Amino acid sequence: MRSGLISFNWDDIDSFSEEQISYYLYLEGKSIKVISKIRNIEEAVVQKHVINGKIKYRILSLSKNCSELLDNIASSVKQEKLTLLSTMENERKEELLKFINENYASMTSKHKETAIWIIGELKDKNQKSILIKAAVNKSVNVRRMAVSAIGKIKDKSFESTLLRVLDDENDQVIVYAIKALIKNEIKSAKEKIIKIKEKTNKEYIKNACEEYLKIVNE
């Protein structure tokens, strides 16, 4: 059975959760009442299963392919995005990351932001080249998302990229870079951070610099 990018086989029912069983029956067109009788559980329980299923799988059910999936993720709220990624099967994640890798260059800025966010949330080190390019993109939001993703991945091989980003013209991007340096435990930026702290009159930048310097000096 398939509904959008949701696919399941009843032969695998032993691996399904109680919630999945109810939701999959619902996808087949069965009513709450019918599912309740089939499963011998209360309608209120079935209703809860279906509601949770809709929350978890709505984006997948609306998407016929990875292109539509990325588009639907881009237009969803953050919590729904997080729920999707936390419940998505590894095979589907790999397909989505493969699509991003092959199509990133032709994406709009909005979709690039979403693609980079996904890379960061899934902590995919295989997309390093995309993140390095994104860190110097003309779009401030793309650069900010790229640096944030680098911080989540925690890979010291991004050192040169983060050091370069400290010269960015946007203050938010710089702060994200400082936070990423902290998360990646990169201590080679001390001199640049000191200069940034001395030049800025913005408290949130000074605070980020102080946090970094405190860790470096420990």
Regions from the PLM with identified roles:
Residues 1-18, 60-61, 107, 111:
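Short, Lys/Arg-enriched anionic-surface-contact patches
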Residues 13-14, 47-65:
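Short, solvent-exposed alpha-helical "recognition" segments
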Residues 14-29:
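Short, amphipathic alpha-helical "recognition" segments used to contact nucleic acids or chromatin
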Residues 20-24, 37-38, 48-57, 71, ...:
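Structural detector for internal amphipathic alpha-helices that build alpha-solenoid repeat scaffolds
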Residues 32:
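Helix-turn-helix DNA-binding elements, focusing on the entry/boundary residues of the two helices
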Residues 44:
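Key DNA-contact positions within bacterial/archaeal DNA-binding proteins
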Residues 59-72, 91-105, 124-136, 155-167, ...:
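Amphipathic alpha-helical scaffolding segments comprising HEAT/armadillo-like alpha-solenoid repeats
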Residues 74-77, 107-108, 138-139, 169-170, ...:
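Short inter-helical turns and helix N-cap capping residues of alpha-solenoid HEAT/ARM repeat scaffolds
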